[in-house]
Curated annotation (Swiss-Prot):
The keyword Glycoprotein does not apply. Substrate binds at residues 75-77, 113-114. It comes from Chromobacterium violaceum (strain ATCC 12472 / DSM 30191 / JCM 1249 / CCUG 213 / NBRC 12614 / NCIMB 9131 / NCTC 9757 / MK). This is Cyclic pyranopterin monophosphate synthase. The gene is moaC. GO terms for biological process: Mo-molybdopterin cofactor biosynthetic process. Pfam families: MoaC. Catalyzes the conversion of (8S)-3',8-cyclo-7,8-dihydroguanosine 5'-triphosphate to cyclic pyranopterin monophosphate (cPMP). It catalyses: (8S)-3',8-cyclo-7,8-dihydroguanosine 5'-triphosphate = cyclic pyranopterin phosphate + diphosphate. Coiled coil: none annotated. It comes from the Bacteria.
Length: 157
């Protein structure tokens, strides 16, 4: 079994030393879904929410969060992202919104956590903006879809 890299031989948490690793192109894609009442979905879809453009604000929040991942997750390295793209898919039949985030950098460690953080904060922002009309929204299916780069190469869910 592979050991957890964020713990030393005595079991103490530490930030992994990536100083000796070559900088390579890194890419990660994550996704998640938020389900809501049909009336709430209509507000989001039609842009009729009194707080403004729900998806536009969620996009900016997701981008900002990805850039702050190292500040939120204790053992993450600060990463100079070269790209963070956020896409929304409106799932009419489910009254749901799917968010996908793609993070890229040229670095010594991966960007999976940045993509996952972007997705989570984007979904939480949608929840925050819509909670006054629908407290029963459900965030689900947050996961890494793919990662590429570094020693471990390409991985896909």
């Amino acid at each position: 079994m592979t050991r957890l890299t964020h713990f030393d031989d005595s079991g103490q948490a530490h930030m992994v030393d990536v100083g000796g690793k070559a900088a390579t192109a890194r890419r990660a894609v994550a996704e998640g879904v938020i389900r809501m009442l049909p009336a709430t979905f209509a507000l989001v879809k039609d842009g009729g929410h009194k707080k403004g453009d729900v998806l536009g604000i969620a996009r900016v929040a997701a981008i900002m969060a990805a850039k702050k991942t190292w500040d939120l997750i204790p053992l993450c390295h600060p990463i100079a992202l070269t790209r963070l793209a956020v896409e929304f898919e409106l799932l009419d039949a489910e009254s749901a919104v799917r968010i996908a985030a793609t993070a890229e950098c040229m670095g010594q460690t991966g960007v999976e956590m940045e993509a996952l953080t972007a997705v989570n904060v984007g979904l939480l922002t949608i929840y925050d903006m819509c909670k006054a009309v629908d407290r029963g929204m459900e965030i689900t299916g947050v996961r890494l879809l793919e990662k590429d780069g570094g020693k471990s190469g390409r991985w896909r869910a």
